[in-house]
Amino acid sequence: MPPKQAQSKKTVEKEKKKKVEDKTFGLKNKNKSKKVAAYVSQVEAQVKHSGLQNKEAALKEKAKRDKELAEKAKKEAESILVNTIVQSKVPLGVDPKSIVCEYFKQGVTCPKGNRCKFAHDLAAGRKSEKIDIYTDRRKDEDTMENWDEAKLKSVVEKKRTTENKAKPTAIICKFFLDAIESKKYGWFWECPNGGEKCAYQHCLPEGYQLKKKKSREEDEVEEIPIEELIEEERAKLTKSTPVTLETFLRWKEEKRLQKEKAAKDAQDKRLADIKAGKTSMSGREMFVFNPDLFVDDESAIDTKSKEYEKSEEEIAALANQINTSLFTDGGVLPSDDDDDDDDDDDDDEDGDDEEEDDDEEEGEYEEEEASDE
């Protein structure tokens, strides 16, 4: 089927003009009212640019479809590739996060996502790898294979100018040693003495021992067990006597005599110091050296003898006397008999008062009768 011929410009303009007339049909005062004129111009602009808008919309739709198709193709490729990827096994004692996930390494979405036990970071293997402090990394990195033409020319020129100069020094860089001792040396460490241009060595010679490691080894000196120490001392003996009951008893007696002699010498020295006034004598020493000072004479009293024992009644009376002295300022409290005597005296005084009253009444009565007569 032959392709359709494109419309001419005149036909397109006629169609646009017709669309504008159809949309503005029936409007009054097209040439007088500003609002109507603005609406007409807006419709004309829409009709004029409708072709461009349709073209842009078509391009956007096409790009969207292409993107969806690409994603679909990628998912299909991933689904095929997932079945072929085999996850590496974790060796015993190795952290899984130090191993890069095979799916992530191949650029495929990991089916486990965040729950994956392997690392989703391409630098994980490099981070876990221990750096070698006995080799200078600058020598390995700066090889002739990595040189370009400018680098090659600079090396040749440098060799010409430095042929008669001294060879590179074998002295170890002090900044490198400090970084090793303080545990700051790593893949991203840079030497403060010029970085890669530092003239000193950035590696340790074979057999070099760090100060921290040396001090740690000195602190961790292995203690020899007592059994091994005894065996070593026994092996050093040149002549030895077999241990029997007789030799053991003789050795024990000698030790006892030596101990007694040492105690006697110490006692004599102590006594000599006391006599010389260099030190004072304790109570126990006074009793040991001169027991006569502690013998009782005739005036001594034995408080535990029966002569000084008191009965319970005497003790109670003594206690009562102490209690009464607390309230009477040393006086004696009145007894019950004293209370009875006081009561009798009061009764006698009352009786005397009553008799006096009776006598007075009788006298008054006699005086009244005498006056009546």
Swiss-Prot record:
Gene3D superfamilies: 6.20.400.10, Zinc finger, CCCH-type
Disulfide bonds: none
Zn finger residue spans: C3H1-type: 95-123, 167-205
One matching Pfam family: zf-CCCH
GO molecular-function terms, A-Z: zinc ion binding
This protein's record includes keyword Cell membrane: no
SUPFAM superfamilies found in the cross-reference section: CCCH zinc finger (SSF90229)
GO biological process: cytoplasmic translation
Extent of Acidic residues compositional bias: 335-373
Cellular component, GO, one term: cytosol
The name this protein goes by in its record: Zinc finger CCCH domain-containing protein 15 homolog
Region (Disordered): 1-27, 325-373
The keyword Zinc belongs to this UniProt entry's keyword annotation: yes
Similarity annotation: Belongs to the ZC3H15/TMA46 family.
Keywords: Coiled coil, Metal-binding, Repeat, Zinc, Zinc-finger
Basic and acidic residues composition-biased segments: 10-25
Organism (species): Dictyostelium discoideum
InterPro entries in the record: ZC3H15/TMA46_C (IPR032378), Znf_CCCH (IPR000571), Znf_CCCH_sf (IPR036855)
